[in-house]
Curated annotation (Swiss-Prot):
Membrane topology note: Multi-pass membrane protein
HAMAP family hit by this protein: UPF0114
Keyword Transmembrane helix assigned: yes
Coiled-coil region: none
Main location: membrane
Record carries keyword Cell membrane: yes
GO CC entries: plasma membrane
Family designation: Belongs to the UPF0114 family.
Chain segments annotated as transmembrane: 15-35, 53-73, 109-126, 136-156
Stated name of the protein: UPF0114 protein PputGB1_0714
Keywords from the named record: Cell membrane, Membrane, Transmembrane, Transmembrane helix
Biological source species: Pseudomonas putida (strain GB-1)
């Protein structure tokens, strides 16, 4: 009975595979939105103010960071929890493939969240004259919560590895 239960639990890891595939569909949707934004801004690039152009570029950077985060979670999560990727040695291989454990993945995710939050905060500050002080204060508090959380996670990770 114990062996059957253990084998069933071990096999259940494959339930994560469609979830990771779903993330790739999310990446496709993000790429479509990215290029929709590019196509939308290009015809109007000369009519945009510098601040508006910077906001669009920050939005594109934000989407690229989220896309990188999706790829990282999708591939390393699959490798850590489902199955090792069998990639031909003759093909191009990401240098972190097979080296990112769940602890380092958490740190990369935390760093990405801080970077994404920073871009959102910069976007908010660029329009600060039209935003209430309370909203700005809460945005900074939330961002600092992300920063402190990432720092604490890194510190705890360092403590547990030594």
């Amino acid at each position: 009975m114990e062996r059957i239960l253990e084998n069933a639990m071990y096999a259940s890891r494959w339930l994560l595979a469609p979830i990771y595939f779903g993330l790739s569909l999310g990446l496709l949707a993000l790429a479509l939105k990215f290029f929709q934004e590019v196509v939308h801004v290009l015809p109007n690039v000369f009519a945009l103010s510098e601040a508006d152009l910077i906001l669009v570029i920050l939005s594109l950077i934000d989407m690229s960071l989220v896309g990188g985060l999706l790829v990282m979670v999708m591939i390393s999560g699959y490798e850590n929890f489902v199955s090792q990727l069998d990639i031909d040695e003759s093909k191009e291989k990401l240098n972190w493939l097979g080296k990112m454990d769940s602890s380092s993945l958490k740190m990369k995710v935390a760093a990405s969240i801080v970077a994404i939050s920073s871009i959102h905060l910069l976007r908010v500050f660029m329009d600060a004259q039209n935003i209430s002080t309370d909203y700005l204060m809460w945005y900074v508090i939330i961002h600092m919560t992300f920063v402190i959380s990432a720092f604490c996670m890194g510190y705890l990770d360092k403590l547990t590895k030594h």
